[in-house]
């Protein structure tokens, strides 16, 4: 997912995995490529607020959003089932006016293939949460098409579909995120 409001350096968010040494290696690798990495949790400031600042300064944000890592993701229909995806990309587009442009990646032998989709515009109707939810539903549809075209390249090692989620674990994640069953997320 690319959210753009101009050109410049790239910022992303990384899930804070355990042990910390593994997270540090992921961050060091990405930073070695010139990517600014914000922690999804445990940072000195909100990743969402920093991303909004970067976008307003004309920089790029590249965000993975095909799974809910916080418990506060948005519910979408995905392959005919309810699923939860991170809503931050759409919420950032609504708040900052940055372009929301889904990207599909796949392998072609030893090389990458990529399709950068056209901007998903902010809907004229609804409040900011409704607008972001409608945009994330469009993202889900584009992801479905990309996964159908390249199913071998969707590397999902966690439950995505609501029916597959452990209710107790989901409730704990939602409680930790302070969201309940929110429509928001970042």
Regions found by a protein language model. Name each.
Residues 6-7, 32-33, 45-186:
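Non-catalytic C-terminal accessory region of glycerolipid acyltransferases
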Residues 1-59:
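Conserved nucleotide-cofactor-binding alpha/beta core module
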């Amino acid at each position: 997912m690319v959210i753009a409001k101009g050109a410049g350096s790239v910022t992303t968010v990384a899930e804070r995995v355990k042990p910390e040494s593994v997270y540090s290696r992921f961050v060091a690798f990405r930073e070695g490529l010139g990517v600014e990495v914000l922690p999804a949790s445990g940072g000195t400031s909100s990743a969402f607020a920093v991303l909004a600042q970067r976008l307003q300064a004309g920089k790029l944000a590249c965000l993975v959003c095909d799974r809910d890592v916080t418990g506060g993701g948005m519910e979408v229909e995905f392959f005919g089932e309810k699923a939860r995806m991170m809503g931050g990309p759409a919420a950032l587009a609504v708040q900052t006016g940055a372009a929301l442009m889904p990207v599909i990646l796949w392998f072609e032998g030893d090389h990458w293939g990529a399709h950068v989709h056209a901007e998903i515009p902010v809907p004229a109707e609804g409040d900011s949460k409704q607008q972001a939810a409608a945009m994330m539903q469009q993202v889900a549809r584009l992801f479905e098409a990309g996964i159908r075209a390249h199913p071998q390249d969707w590397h999902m090692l966690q439950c995505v579909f609501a029916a597959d989620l452990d209710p107790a674990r989901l409730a704990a994640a939602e409680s930790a995120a302070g969201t309940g069953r929110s429509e928001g997320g970042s």
